[in-house]
């Protein structure tokens, strides 16, 4: 009865998490509020629970109140199958934890850590509760030096046959270990970090090879009743796939009691898998930086360049059975990780390629996220298998201006340059003189080419006949700005004058007269420049007179202007008149045309009597062409070339 009352008091003092563990251990429903869970646990005691459940209650109570000193009577084991058993346990049977000659009793140890004597007394619990220490080795972590082994690799075993399982572990620290952890504290940042850490690792229970970190499914860890943060879940690659955590070592230093008298407890809960067993271990490690790992890699030495040359010859050896043979290999001097020039070329011994990557970038990337995968072939490239290539170190030393090289069949190499550069540099250099001579030749050749291009641009042949289309494509190269004439009135500049009849089409308002008082006449005369042009050919169809004519937004065809100039060749007064071409340059240009002579086209009236006016509007020309014009005087309307169909109407 005393034991029942004591167990009832223990159950009444448990929290929700302990009650859920107890009910789950007993195979009862563990969902509900605290009073519901407490009622279920008390009904379990009243119905008569098994000795294993009673021991679970005491274990949970000891974890709930770890500072309470348990008497040997509290650790008494009830009878199993009505077999006689000792009522109490002597202090000699309580397991001891020894660390460097400092014995200390651990009242927090679960029943699973009792001595072999009690294992024989509990035959039905031996296989489930006894922690197995198989010969399991975990892979060495490059960024951590192993200082001590706090808990050896131990199988995750539970006396619960359900899918969701839980087990408890305990360990204690020695004064030396406490001193190492305390002295490595770094409080420079926002968070307190330790260089010497207590590290928790999980792996599969396999002894074939060193095991990688592998978390059990639905893992949950509590250190000294405080939940431990685990790595976040990875996003699933497929729909419906359960997300998994990346398996990494867990740093539990901040949750560990830095004391030599009070042990630390670790409660692990997980979901059991059929055909898979897991193990855990706790280590005391020292964290390293990427700089230390790089120094250790350099301390290993540089691999002999002859090894790489032998590998090149092996790859480029022709296979007699194959019709395709590799005669050369191209290798980049840029790191595939950072796309920068290599500084410390390295690769793994397990890689079959010649391409190297930069050791500094590779180690720094794995410091942030340890994957240790070769960036060239995507195979495993652990730190222990990295080597520095001596051949690439020589290439980087002598080839400073090239980012790609080519290996030949005999093991030699040559830099690969672009077509614009001089391709005279190889593995054996020609010296300074050769470099200077090639540079001078290149400069002379480039200067000669540039001078030839300038000459071609400066020469323009105006005697060659060209079509009007070609002239319209390049008008800027052949057109010149006409000079101002002091004798021509400025108010008529750029406007065709029709003395008797204005154009019926008015696109823009009339331009106002410009005040010429501020213009110096001497400057205008100096601005005029004489024309030195060769005689124009007889065919005036290809000439463009439009740049010299600007009407009130009227556009005239070049063929019409050419025909008009040919028809009035006998009338010199019209050519020299300022009403038709007010610019001096235009007069000089047309003087040469009239002097050279041109073929005159027949007029509609058979005479030049209609040449009194300069030009007519597009409406009058269209009416003249259609022969619908009524009686008009020749002084009012100028009838010019009604048979020419090249007039474009802008109405």
Swiss-Prot record:
Major enzyme class: transferase
Cross-link (Glycyl lysine isopeptide (Lys-Gly) (interchain with G-Cter in SUMO2)): 40, 46, 137, 238, 453, 493
Modified-residue entries (N-acetylalanine), positions: 2
Record GO biological process: cell surface receptor signaling pathway via JAK-STAT; DNA damage response; fat cell differentiation; G1/S transition of mitotic cell cycle; negative regulation of apoptotic process; negative regulation of transcription by RNA polymerase II; positive regulation of DNA-templated transcription; positive regulation of proteasomal ubiquitin-dependent protein catabolic process
Sequence repeats: 520-523, 557-560, 598-601, 612-615
Motif Nuclear localization signal in this chain: 56-64, 368-380
Keyword Zinc part of the UniProt annotation: yes
Region spans: SUMO1-binding: 462-473
Residues covered by the SAP domain: 11-45
Gene3D superfamilies: PINIT domain (2.60.120.780), SAP domain (1.10.720.30), Zinc/RING finger domain, C3HC4 (zinc finger) (3.30.40.10)
Main subcellular location: nucleus
Positions where Phosphoserine occurs in the chain: 467-468, 483, 485, 488, 503, 510, 522
Site (Cleavage): 100, 433
Tissue/organ expression: Expressed in numerous tissues with highest level in testis.
Record localization: Nucleus; Nucleus speckle; Nucleus, PML body; Cytoplasm, Cytoskeleton
Post-translation changes: Sumoylated.
Region (Required for interaction with MSX1): 2-200
Residue numbers carrying Phosphothreonine: 487
Motif residue range(s): LXXLL motif: 19-23
Assigned protein family: Belongs to the PIAS family.
Protein name per UniProt: E3 SUMO-protein ligase PIAS1
Organism whose genome encodes this protein: Homo sapiens
Gene: PIAS1
